[in-house]
């Protein structure tokens, strides 16, 4: 589009939740000031004014509170901050930490290495606090979340 450099590349992660704030920002609306939006505008990223997306939460957070055939086949939540991605599985409470800059395939779990234990705990705390703040649905064995409304299940962080 106009004002966007041709063939521009960035490794700054964005997510679907960033689209509404970005479109709104480009259109000149003030929706960005709403506190109930998870995403942030990447308008400045598009127009080479910044290499970051500013969100109310630190990093990108993903939450899959049910078993499925697509997302790792296990209930989990994940957070990406800077180069690191932490995944927390709910069926056995495993936590994995990956350095996305040096291990894009997420094949080397760094969470159990002594030097990374502090970072693992820090990211897990940020993730847990966010899930609690938004009252995210909580996984329970045998629940698919597709057959019953969340109000009936009544299981939240």
Predicted regions and their residues:
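Long, internal low-complexity/basic segments
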Residues: 19, 93, 107-157
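Intrinsically disordered, low-complexity polar regions and short flexible loop motifs
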Residues: 103
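C-terminal cap/loop subdomain of S1 sulfatases and analogous C-terminal strand-loop tails that border
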Residues: 3-8, 12, 17-100, 151-155
């Amino acid at each position: 589009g106009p004002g966007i450099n041709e063939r521009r590349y960035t490794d700054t992660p964005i997510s679907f939740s960033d689209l509404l704030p970005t479109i709104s920002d480009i259109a000149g609306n003030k929706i960005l000031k709403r506190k109930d939006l998870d995403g942030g505008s990447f308008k400045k990223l598009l127009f080479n004014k910044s290499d970051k997306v500013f969100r109310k939460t630190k990093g990108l957070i993903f939450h899959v509170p049910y078993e499925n055939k697509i997302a790792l086949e296990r209930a989990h939540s994940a957070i990406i901050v800077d180069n690191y991605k932490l995944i927390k599985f709910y069926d056995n409470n495993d936590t994995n930490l990956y350095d996305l800059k040096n291990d894009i395939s997420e094949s080397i779990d760094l969470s159990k290495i002594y030097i990374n234990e502090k970072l693992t705990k820090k990211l897990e705390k940020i993730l847990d606090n966010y899930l609690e703040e938004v009252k995210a649905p909580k996984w329970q064995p045998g629940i698919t979340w597709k057959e019953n409304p969340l109000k009936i299940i009544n299981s939240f962080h």
